Amino acid sequence: MPVHSREKKESNHNDMEVDYPENEGSSSEEDDSDSSSGSEEGDSSEMDDEDCERRRMECLDEMSTLEKQFTDLKDQLYKERLSQVDAKLQEVKADQAQEYLEPLANLQENMQIRTKVAGIYRELCLESVKNKHDCEIQAARQHCESEKLLLYDTVQSELEEKIRRLEEDRHSIDITSELWNDELQSRRKRKDPFSPDKKKKPVVVSGPYIVYMLQDLDILEDWTTIRKAMASFGPHRVKPEVTVKIEKHQHSARSEEGRLHYDGEWYGRGQTICIDKKDEFPTSAVITTINSDEVWFKRQDGSKSKLYISQLQKGKYSIKHI
């Protein structure tokens, strides 16, 4: 190499200086040696520059060659990888690649499992809907049967009450006829200006006392109530002088289109009400039927009773919403 040759020459020159220290006798020889060493140094510097340039060119050539080889290898590697990918893609399309077949088998297995589970879930949903439909049908039938029984009981109670009232009317027909005769006589006397009893003072009577200012139906109901009370207490419990006072109409009560209007409020079937009677504790009940002259209700213990609208008008009973 140029640098090594130069160092070798310098080392040789030093050896020469060391080898001839004793030849100090001739100065001419020293001058010749100095001139020869100077020429050799000039030639060696020129050779070193040429060698450096030549080596630089060689290095550049080698670098370009290596870059070309690297580029060729990179292109070759890209083509090989591309060919491998294309081959693998063809295998996948042909269902032959193991990397594709194994996940595909897992996916198909999962699909079969999920399809089976979905089928079972569908059957369960259908069964649940069918059971719900059957339950609704059964509930509707039971509701219909209960409504039929309730309607039957209501109609039966109404008919029995009408039969009972007819029986009572049949037994008390003679009494009512006497009442009618008395009423007619009293009207005739009021119309007759020359009647001697017109200015007669009121007579205090004992026993049931009936006010004839009421309607005929109210009189009949009051008389029936009095007879029931007398029959329940018995003849030995009846006090000798008891005056029954009929209260005047103090409340507004009427039946319109299957509803009851009482003291400015409307009451309908199925509503829960509180029934208040004098000298008794209030009770809650549910309205079952509203007729033209009576209201049927059902108590909490299951017993059924009725109220006459005239009783509400007189204030014997009072009702209110709960």
Curated annotation (Swiss-Prot):
Its main location: nucleus. One of its GO terms (cellular component) is Sin3-type complex. Pfam families: Sds3 (PF08598). Residues 50-99, 147-178 form a coiled coil. Involved in the histone deacetylase (HDAC1)-dependent transcriptional repression activity. GO terms for molecular function: histone deacetylase binding. It is found in: Nucleus. Belongs to the BRMS1 family. Residues 1-56 are annotated as: Disordered. This is Breast cancer metastasis-suppressor 1-like protein. Residues 17-51 have a biased composition (Acidic residues). InterPro entries: Sds3. Residues 1-16 have a biased composition (Basic and acidic residues). Gene3D superfamilies: 1.20.5.1500. One of its GO terms (biological process) is negative regulation of transcription by RNA polymerase II. Keywords: Coiled coil, Nucleus, Repressor, Transcription, Transcription regulation. The gene is brms1l. Transmembrane segments: none annotated.
